């Protein structure tokens, strides 16, 4: 006998709760809404509607994956970022709300100058570069990643948001394979987790997100060191370098900055008051 939407969510929430998944009811409802291709308003207003046996079976598969710790974003293959929807797979980091600070900081730095060229280092899903291109219709970007699989996802997201003609994708370890040129802005959400901190991460992050996009050496600063050193060759004078950092890294990052090369403009905090984004200007 078919079960109703409400019954499916209740059973799903109980299963996820037993598996230690936070906000189990919300997650169960979101997974069912995705499966039914409906929004949460529909789910709430049609709680007594039945779901088919096929839908129930698929929903149970979703729940099984989520109960094992797989992020919902990988199960559904999508994540919202700055009002846009992006395809995500285990080949790319899941875009986070705190990374939207990079977008806001970049918009503030660029101001009214729309004809900008910028580089996104470690583009992953492409969410940063693509979002900035939608904000600046005359901008052009180069998006770099060390992962072929990640670049494939980013290319599909660029096509989805119709910016393919304004973005070039480069397979490169930082700037190693990037032809010499200068940009108005370099932006990055680099890996910054210390190797010995991996065990402390949530299982959704630790066991499912790509390690290459998370960790960067013993102190988590290996990639940021390269970024601060190498970016100066790719920036015009008075151009900007903008990147995300870990919650406890602002002092260490400040010590990496050569004052003869860079002016430290700001370290932006997130809504919890945690330093998240560093803004530098090339002298």
Please name every model-derived segment.
Residues 31, 69, 99, 128, ...:
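Residue-level signal for inorganic ion chemistry
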Residues 16, 110, 158, 231, ...:
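Conserved hydrophobic residues forming the short capping helix/wall of the S-adenosyl-L-methionine
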Residues 192-223:
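Mobile active-site "lid"/loop adjacent to the S-adenosyl-L-methionine
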Residues 163, 209, 235-237:
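Helix-to-beta-strand junctions that scaffold the AdoMet/dcAdoMet cofactor pocket
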Residues 32-108:
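Conserved AdoMet
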Residues 97-200:
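Conserved SAM/SAH cofactor-binding pocket of Class I
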Residues 1-44, 51:
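Non-catalytic accessory regions of SAM-dependent methyltransferases
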Residues 218-280:
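Conserved Class I SAM-dependent methyltransferase catalytic core
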């Amino acid at each position: 006998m078919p079960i109703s939407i409400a019954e499916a969510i209740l059973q799903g929430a109980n299963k996820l709760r037993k598996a230690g998944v936070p906000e189990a009811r919300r997650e169960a409802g979101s997974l069912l809404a995705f499966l039914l291709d409906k929004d949460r308003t529909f789910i709430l207003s049609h709680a007594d509607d039945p779901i088919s046996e096929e839908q129930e079976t698929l929903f149970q598969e979703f729940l099984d994956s989520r109960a094992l710790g797989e992020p919902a974003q990988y199960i559904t293959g999508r994540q919202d970022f700055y009002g846009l929807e992006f395809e995500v797979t285990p080949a790319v980091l899941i875009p986070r709300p705190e990374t939207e600070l990079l977008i806001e900081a970049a918009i503030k730095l660029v101001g009214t100058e729309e004809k900008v060229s910028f580089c996104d280092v470690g583009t992953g899903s492409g969410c940063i570069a693509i979002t900035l291109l939608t904000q600046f219709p005359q901008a052009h970007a180069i998006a770099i990643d060390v992962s072929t699989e990640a670049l494939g996802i980013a290319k599909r997201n660029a096509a989805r948001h119709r910016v393919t003609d304004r973005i070039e994708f480069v397979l490169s370890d930082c700037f190693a394979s990037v032809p010499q040129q200068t940009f108005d802005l370099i932006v990055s959400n680099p890996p910054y987790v210390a190797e010995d901190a991996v065990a402390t991460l949530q299982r959704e992050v630790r066991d499912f997100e790509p390690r290459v996009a998370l960790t960067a050496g013993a102190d988590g600063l290996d990639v940021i060191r390269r970024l601060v050193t190498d970016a100066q060759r790719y920036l015009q004078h008075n151009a900007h370098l903008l990147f995300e950092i870990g919650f406890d890294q602002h002092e260490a990052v400040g010590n990496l900055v050569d004052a003869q090369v860079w002016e430290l403009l700001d370290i932006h905090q997130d809504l919890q008051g945690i330093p998240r984004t560093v803004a530098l200007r090339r002298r």
